[in-house]
Amino acid sequence: MRKTLTSIRFLSDGIRVKDKWNSLISDLVVEPTNSTGPLSGTTYIVKDNIATSHGYTTAASKILSNYESPFNATIIDLLSSNGSKLIGKSNLDEFGMGSANYNSYFNKVTNPYDNTKVPGGSSGGSAASVAGKMCSFSIGTDTGGSVRLPASYCNVFGFKPTYGRISRWGVIPYAQTLDTVGIIGENVNIIKRVYDVLNKYDDKDPTCLPEEVRQKIPTTKKETLTIGVPHEFVLKELSADVRESWEYALSKICKLGHLVKPISIKTIKKALPSYYTLATAEAASNLSRYDSIRYGYNTNESVNSPIELIATNRSDGFGSEVQRRILLGNYTLSSDSGDHYLRATQIREELCAEFSSIFNNSHVLLQDEQSSDKVDLIMAPTSTSTAPTWDEFVSANEKNFLNSYVNDVLTVPASLAGIPAISVPVNGIGIQLMGQFGDDDLVLQLADQI
């Protein structure tokens, strides 16, 4: 167990009193460069794995606890030039690895609606800051559900756009083929306003969708939508209140004139193990850069060799969950286990193709297979239950760390497919809408009606 110093949080006295949930790592006041933009008058808090030239960028890790970025992430400059004021950096699971905001060097985040419950992760601080009304909106990152799950637990909206819609330049990577900048807000209106500002091509990010691809994506609105309900999401583990809210949301959209039909996406059943195989492999590669020699926390211990110093720095600088995922990822990439990685990539390709074939609109990057079950959007729960208490989460995690991984079972399919998804609060429970690759506006259109 690493020693955690709560005094390391970089907060002014006023914010420290206001932040009852430990949702912030640092508070800032960075005025916008343009005070008359479309986001004029708004304030936001950004997840602390996104680079800002003001203050620290820690990824909630000891190994980066004193790191100051010399540049802003692209999204920070976009928000500033469009009128929004940055007022803080939010707490998170270290390097985005976790589903409860438990794995932070700066201590756990609590849920504003019930401080005995987890806020979800890894963007728990971002969700808690919105639920606690500390800002107009917050920015998080979503790798396997890290915006949608905390939004569900904290009873706010959490939007993961299509992969490549928003620039990742300046985002500290966990798994770069999955990491997506997401937006958390109290309503769809503010999320749409922020999304319109950030939905721009950035030549500094090679995964950002180029203009010629964006122009091929349909932009027409449909009055009557067909909503698919995959039976693979009808899990026996769903709690009664989650089922009830899901049924309520489906009945509501029927009353609005939309159609609902059952569908099947068989590869969803293989999504969770595929996700953790790929994500940990990418994490092992991405986090190999942190040696604490050039920047970051250094133990400054007297050792016999540079390699020994790096090993000491990494052992002391990374938390237990990050170390676990690095080990899992290195094993996956080893010669003895390479077949698992290849199989996971195949499953991901199959899932992308199956999702693509189910939607009415075509996928701009894939050739769609034919399906008789065409729908416009998909609706499913965001999580299998409401937020667990801290005692329940810790007890389950101590019995088997894999229990916390299962929390992502309903969110990782959209992440693997790279499709847009939003968690909408329905009677205090998150209900998830998913759309075709690039159909972000259609997802937001229906989310605003629920």
Curated annotation (Swiss-Prot):
Question: Which superkingdom does the taxonomy of this entry point to?
Answer: Eukaryota
The record's active-site residues are K47 (charge relay system), S122 (charge relay system), S146 (acyl-ester intermediate)
Q: Which InterPro entries does this UniProt record tie to the protein?
A: Amidase (IPR000120), Amidase_CS (IPR020556), Amidase_dom (IPR023631), AS_sf (IPR036928), GatA (IPR004412)
Q: Alphabetically list the UniProt keywords.
A: ATP-binding, Ligase, Mitochondrion, Nucleotide-binding, Protein biosynthesis
Q: Which reaction does it catalyse?
A: L-glutamyl-tRNA(Gln) + L-glutamine + ATP + H2O = L-glutaminyl-tRNA(Gln) + L-glutamate + ADP + phosphate + H(+)
Task: Tell me where it resides.
Answer: Mitochondrion
Q: Which Gene3D superfamilies match?
A: Amidase signature (AS) domain
* EC number(s) recorded for this UniProt protein: 6.3.5.7
In the record, biological process GO terms are:
glutaminyl-tRNAGln biosynthesis via transamidation; mitochondrial translation
This protein's GO CC annotations: glutamyl-tRNA(Gln) amidotransferase complex; mitochondrion
GO molecular function annotations of the record: ATP binding; glutaminyl-tRNA synthase (glutamine-hydrolyzing) activity
Q: State whether it acts alone or in a complex, and with which partners, per the record.
A: Subunit of the heterotrimeric GatFAB amidotransferase (AdT) complex, composed of A, B and F subunits.
What family does the database annotate?
Belongs to the amidase family. GatA subfamily.
Q: Mind telling me which HAMAP family this protein's record contains? A: GatA
Its annotated function is as follows: Allows the formation of correctly charged Gln-tRNA(Gln) through the transamidation of misacylated Glu-tRNA(Gln) in the mitochondria. The reaction takes place in the presence of glutamine and ATP through an activated gamma-phospho-Glu-tRNA(Gln).
Any idea what this protein is called? Answer: Glutamyl-tRNA(Gln) amidotransferase subunit A, mitochondrial
This chain's source organism reads Candida albicans (strain WO-1)
User: What lineage, starting at the top, does this entry show?
Assistant: Eukaryota, Fungi, Dikarya, Ascomycota, Saccharomycotina
This protein's gene is called HER2
